Amino acid sequence: MSVERQWYLYLLECTGGSIYTGITTDVARRFAQHQAGKGAKYTRSRKPLRVLGQVAFPSKSEALKAELATKRMSSAQKIAFCAKLEQPET
């Protein structure tokens, strides 16, 4: 029986004021990848400035569902959502 890793939904503030949403098992590692230009295509042209927040999920499936719901939010809704999230120590 395999043990699933904990997955995180994370939101990044990017240049131009945009907000990027993604999922990962390691937020600090993924943020570093985005900053190095090796993350998502979106963050290659809109450099990430900081992690706005993160929230843990017990499975990838649950994190993906939350990611989809978050990506459907407006920027104002994402900012309000981030105010409630676990703040990273990066």
UniProtKB/Swiss-Prot annotation:
Domain GIY-YIG: 5-80
Name this protein carries in UniProt: UPF0213 protein Reut_B5558
InterPro entries linked: GIY-YIG_endonuc, GIY-YIG_endonuc_sf, UPF0213_domain
UniProt family annotation: Belongs to the UPF0213 family.
Species annotation: Cupriavidus pinatubonensis (strain JMP 134 / LMG 1197) (Cupriavidus necator (strain JMP 134))
Domain of life the protein comes from: Bacteria
